[in-house]
């Protein structure tokens, strides 16, 4: 059996000088699945699983980054994730990797316990959430993205039909740049309140009647949906910029209806 010479110094290849002198904007690890806990709006701790992407900028003269340090960062951060802890993670990553710029992104399922509108039965509904942050030149920007499933009902179908109207499930995706902490539930509420109707995991017959009639009384085109949500985001000072999408999975077509609004309040006229 070979034994390592105590005097042997293991070479640090990635720290050597690269003669090609080409900088790399982003290098790191992608799709790292790792346990995660998050704080809910009520202060409860919710366990989930995050899919992480972590990267830094690599100078032209440096051959490689320290890949193991990205995973080590996740191992060191087991406390429930908050906006401030996430900001601190970015700063810690830059320090560990001796980098001037970097980015962290984590996507995870987030569950909300919802109460049916009539029967009062409770059930969980899942939402896809992404928290992202990037730092460069000492400036850190934070982004919260939420995909919210809702119901939409067509105003034209209601207007021209003797009875009924076509309706479908829709996705509202809000990708907001934050100036202050915004709970995930706050963005979910905005999307659900501006849709024809929200969704629940479990409904009894009286609830189904309510949902059907609620959507019928609140018809919206995909254009209406994004504009109404955008108005709510415009009024929220905690959000400085956003990309907002709505997609209706049309029940009478084999395609979707789609709309997007992008706005940066810092550059608004």
From Swiss-Prot:
Gene3D superfamilies assigned to the protein according to its UniProt record, in alphabetical order: Urate Oxidase
Keywords: Hydrolase
One GO MF term: GTP cyclohydrolase I activity
Biological-process GO terms, alphabetical: tetrahydrofolate biosynthetic process
InterPro entries, alphabetized: GTP_cyclohydrolase_FolE2, GTP_cyclohydrolase_FolE2/MptA
Pathway(s) annotated for this protein in UniProt: Cofactor biosynthesis; 7,8-dihydroneopterin triphosphate biosynthesis; 7,8-dihydroneopterin triphosphate from GTP: step 1/1
Protein EC: 3.5.4.16
Site (May be catalytically important) location in chain: 154
Signal peptide (from-to): none
Matching Pfam families: GCHY-1 (PF02649)
Catalytic reactions on record: GTP + H2O = 7,8-dihydroneopterin 3'-triphosphate + formate + H(+)
Top-level lineage group: Bacteria
The keyword Iron is annotated on this UniProt entry: no
Similarity section: Belongs to the GTP cyclohydrolase IV family.
Database matches in NCBIfam families: PRK13674.1-1
Record function comment: Converts GTP to 7,8-dihydroneopterin triphosphate.
Protein name listed in UniProt: GTP cyclohydrolase FolE2
Gene source species: Burkholderia multivorans (strain ATCC 17616 / 249)
Gene: folE2
